């Protein structure tokens, strides 16, 4: 399966050539904006994580591969950060099926009740 969205990171990081529009450049470029962008990538800052994290992910998501959600969850677990992961095998980027949406809302608001009071 292919999608134009596979090019979004390049657009977000340098594919835009409009004058005055800030973009960092491709991930492999060495321009200062691209280097700064990579230096601030969340995966390089895991050692600073201390906020509880709830990861919800649709396994059919082609925008954000499920492995990225799992990686964030695993990193939080390894750091001892309170964390929970909820996978939806039949959902994409958004959790839209009625039964899944109800489950998502219950989990989300329970999480807020637990950590935001």
Regions found by a protein language model. Name each.
Residues 1-117:
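Active-site-proximal cap/loop segments of hydrolase catalytic domains
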């Amino acid at each position: 399966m292919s999608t134009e969205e596979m090019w979004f990171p390049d657009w977000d990081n340098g594919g835009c050539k409009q004058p005055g529009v800030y973009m960092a450049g491709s991930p492999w470029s060495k321009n200062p904006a691209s280097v700064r962008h990579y230096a601030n990538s969340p995966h390089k800052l895991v050692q600073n994580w201390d906020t509880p994290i709830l990861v919800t992910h649709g396994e059919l998501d082609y925008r954000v591969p499920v492995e990225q959600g799992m990686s964030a969850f695993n990193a939080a677990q390894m750091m001892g950060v309170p964390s929970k992961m909820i996978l939806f095998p039949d959902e994409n980027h958004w959790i839209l099926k009625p039964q899944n949406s109800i489950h998502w809302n219950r989990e989300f608001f329970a999480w807020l009740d637990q950590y935001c009071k």
